[in-house]
Amino acid sequence: MNNKNIMIVGAGFSGVVIARQLAEQGYTVKIIDRRDHIGGNSYDTRDPQTDVMVHVYGPHIFHTDNETVWNYVNQYAEMMPYVNRVKATVNGQVFSLPINLHTINQFFAKTCSPDEARALISEKGDSSIVEPQTFEEQALRFIGKELYEAFFKGYTIKQWGMEPSELPASILKRLPVRFNYDDNYFNHKFQGMPKLGYTRMIEAIADHENISIELQREFLPEEREDYAHVFYSGPLDAFYSYQYGRLGYRTLDFEKFTYQGDYQGCAVMNYCSIDVPYTRITEHKYFSPWESHEGSVCYKEYSRACGENDIPYYPIRQMGEMALLEKYLSLAESEKNITFVGRLGTYRYLDMDVTIAEALKTADEFLSSVANQEEMPVFTVPVR
């Protein structure tokens, strides 16, 4: 390949990781992003009033079982130990999530052992539901009406804007209960937070002489001719000017407020009742427990359907969306010299570790395709 110029659209984890891998192999990489900052939705910044590090687009906690990815991020940031312990306000009480032995004993006013709790939950479950088809049936089958209505029903309606009876059972993976006192929200081997924030980490990944970044810059289709390859991490439907219509997303609204002292005593407090309009309140200084701040910055988080001018967060991927997605995939699969990557480019919800793993794989695949004089695929991951 004589032309070693690469264009990357989007300066989130997908874009900068691919850029770094290719820059180290001698490619000249230009990253563009329509926003006025790098980092995508992982962007964080200091609040000028309190000096608290704020996760601008909502909380991002790094958790993975992938040692390669963990070692990768540790090259670019000092990762501090961090365990996500989520609380939930339900019926005037505060409980620990995920539902664990403490939650069960508190909720049912009992002192069950693990085996007794297992028997209790089994008894509460609706065994008449043999093959759960919906989120609601899955919850009723595994945890019963009381826990479902207290912790899942209202929260799910607020989060997805749909009744749990309309959502697929697959959203509620397996039995969402622990029969011990473990209240670590994640099960992953490696968990942490970058000491200086995600923005600094992403800046460090992008800090290479062969990488240039242009912000507040839209991608122009005619630019493709100037580059050997384009990696596009923007919305797939936007690339085609929404010609078949818009793929459905949920978006988030954040109501920011400051407080002197501690507002809620934890990083994340879920509000499970349908009567409370927000899904949760996050208190950002608790995401950096190694720091000390007198003031506090909190976000009330609201979920709703994503409009034309909103930031897309969660791909809906229901039946109608999947039919529309298929039309865009058919268009994309006829392209050459472009690869769609990341959450928006592949219309999939991705945690940060998966995003990084896929970006590393995509860069390797590109280098291999060049070495073997093969065509680089438009998608490097399953998207259907």
Curated annotation (Swiss-Prot):
Keywords: FAD, Flavoprotein, Isomerase, Lipopolysaccharide biosynthesis, Signal. It catalyses: UDP-alpha-D-galactose = UDP-alpha-D-galactofuranose. GO terms for cellular component: cytosol. It is an enzyme of class 5 (isomerase). Its EC number is 5.4.99.9. Its cofactor is FAD. UDP-alpha-D-galactose binds at N84, F151, T156, W160, Y185, N270, R280, Y314, Y349. It comes from the Bacteria. GO terms for molecular function: flavin adenine dinucleotide binding; UDP-galactopyranose mutase activity. Transmembrane segments: none annotated. GO terms for biological process: O antigen biosynthetic process. InterPro entries: UDP-GALP_mutase, UDP-GalPyranose_mutase_C. Binds 1 FAD per subunit. Pathway: Bacterial outer membrane biogenesis; LPS O-antigen biosynthesis. Residues 1-19 form the signal peptide. FAD binds at S14, D33, R34, N41, H60, I61, F219, R343, L350, D351, M352, D353, V354, T355. Catalyzes the interconversion through a 2-keto intermediate of uridine diphosphogalactopyranose (UDP-GalP) into uridine diphosphogalactofuranose (UDP-GalF). PANTHER family: UDP-GALACTOPYRANOSE MUTASE. Homodimer. Belongs to the UDP-galactopyranose/dTDP-fucopyranose mutase family. This is Probable UDP-galactopyranose mutase. It comes from Klebsiella pneumoniae. The lineage of its organism: Bacteria, Pseudomonadati, Pseudomonadota, Gammaproteobacteria, Enterobacterales.
